[in-house]
Structures are given as C-alpha cells and as structure tokens.
C-alpha cells in the first residue's frame, strides 16, 4: 500500500487558492488542484495501517480509502474511480463539502499531518467525469415495484439512485422548483457550484428516475395516496427549520 517511506519524506500538500483579488470577482470555487504527480505523491503517504481508522471509524460511508489511495499512487485511476463509487454515490459532492472526519481519524495524523484524503477523492471522481468513465447504470431487469422517495437532498438522491439500479420504478418528489435540497439551496457556489449537482442529476434521469417538482408531500399528496399507489415510500425530508441563537446583538 503506497510507498513504504513516503509519509516520512513527503510533506502534506493541499490544493492552492486563487489570489484574493481574483476571488473577489466571482462566487465560484477558488481551489486550484494539484498536478497528477503531486496527487500521486500525496496518495503515496497513505500507510498500510493494520486498522485503517479513516475507513472503519472516520468515514460515515465506509469509503475504501486505503484502496483508492494506493490505486492513485499506482496511476490506476479508473480502478480508483470504480472503488470510490462502490461506497459513495456522489463523491464529487463529498469531495468538496465533507468536513473530512476521515482525515481527523488518519493514523498518520497522530504524529504528523494526515493524508489528504478528500483531495484524492475529488481528483479521482473529476478524472472519472473527464475521461467519460462515469456513465448511467440503468437496471438490467425490472422488478415491477414502484417506490416513492420524498425529498431530493443527498439522502433522497442516493436512495432514488440505488433503488432504481435495483430495478424498481422510482418517483422522486421535491417541494421546491429544482432538485437538490440542501445541496442546491443550502450550500453556496464557492463551495459547491450547481453544475456539479446538475451533472449528477442528469445521470439519475438517464437511469430512469422520475422527477416530480413543486409537490409537497402531506399537502399535495396524502399519505393514503402514496401508500395506495406505491409499493414502498422512503422519507428523506431533511431538516429545513432553522434554529436561531436567541442572543443579543
């Protein structure tokens, strides 16, 4: 796994940032990715841990972090992309906005700077999109079952995609006028530009997920209607109510 002594000789290096004067002219992402050689060097810092806490403890998805870091180090980007998608439907999103508990759990971080895991994740998936490796995966067989997914935030989108790939007919209901939930309406463009989300939504539609916008479940559709029309209902409604701090000032 990785280069045996890389973590001793290669310091942590992250993406650089645009100059402040340039950032002030737009609201887009302002990170400048590392070169391929630098990305491979950073991936090589991943050690052959007996217990990879990044994977088993730090990552809520259980991402196969040591595996795809090693594949990046070897230059096997397509395999890395496949392993990344094995546990994560939307790595281009987590690679931009996740707070990286995996890096906080990295064993190397005990006595040194942790491996740049999120940076590797983003580089892998964007390489996958650029090379055309990420394609729609419609089901090979249909089950004939119908499923309603309520809410199009990250949980709803992932549920809809996984259910569709299993062969179920899926309807994704969203009360707003565009899909995405917090990904669209709660995260600013300098962290997550909306073309990133729209690119993945197009994949879901090509796989056969049905989008239903401006539908407020419980108001426009009753629970009785949903249970009668669908074989299953998956609630992914999120938490839209704000909790303001009642403090002066």
Please name every model-derived segment.
Residues 89, 153-155, 178:
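Residue-level detector of alpha-helix initiation sites
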Residues 174, 211-213, 235-237:
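General beta-strand structural signal in soluble alpha/beta enzymes
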Residues 168-184:
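Glycine-rich FAD pyrophosphate-binding loop
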Residues 1-146, 194, 233-249:
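Ferredoxin-type iron-sulfur electron-transfer modules and their immediate structural context
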Residues 160-162, 184-185, 245-249:
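Short amphipathic alpha-helical segments
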Residues 81-88, 101, 120, 182-231:
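N-terminal Rossmann-like dinucleotide/flavin-binding domain of flavoprotein oxidoreductases
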Residues 146-171:
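N-terminal Rossmann-like FAD-binding beta1-loop-alpha1 element of flavoenzymes
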């Amino acid at each position: 796994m990785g280069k045996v002594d890389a973590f001793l000789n290669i310091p942590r290096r992250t993406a650089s940032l645009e100059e402040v004067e340039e950032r002030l002219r737009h609201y887009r992402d302002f990170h400048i990715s590392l070169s391929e050689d630098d990305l491979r060097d950073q991936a090589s810092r991943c050690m052959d841990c007996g217990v990879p806490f990044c994977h088993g403890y730090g990552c809520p998805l259980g991402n196969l972090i040591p595996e795809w870091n090693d594949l990046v180090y070897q230059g096997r980007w397509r395999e890395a992309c496949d392993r990344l998608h094995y546990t994560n439907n939307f790595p281009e999103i987590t690679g931009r906005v996740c707070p990286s508990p995996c890096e906080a759990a990295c064993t190397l971080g005990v006595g040194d700077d942790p491996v740049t895991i999120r940076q590797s994740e983003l580089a892998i998936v964007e390489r996958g999109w650029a090379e055309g490796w990420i394609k729609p995966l419609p089901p090979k067989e249909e089950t004939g079952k119908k499923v309603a997914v309520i809410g199009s935030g990250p949980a709803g989108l992932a549920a809809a995609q996984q259910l569709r790939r299993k062969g179920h007919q899926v309807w994704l209901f969203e009360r707003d006028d565009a899909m995405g939930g917090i990904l669209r309406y709660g995260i600013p463009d300098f962290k997550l530009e909306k073309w990133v989300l729209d690119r993945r939504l197009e994949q879901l539609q090509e796989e056969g997920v049905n989008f239903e916008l401006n539908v407020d479940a419980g108001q426009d559709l009753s629970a009785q209607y949903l249970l009668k029309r669908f074989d299953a209902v998956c609630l992914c409604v999120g938490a839209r109510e704000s909790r303001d701090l009642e403090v002066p000032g």
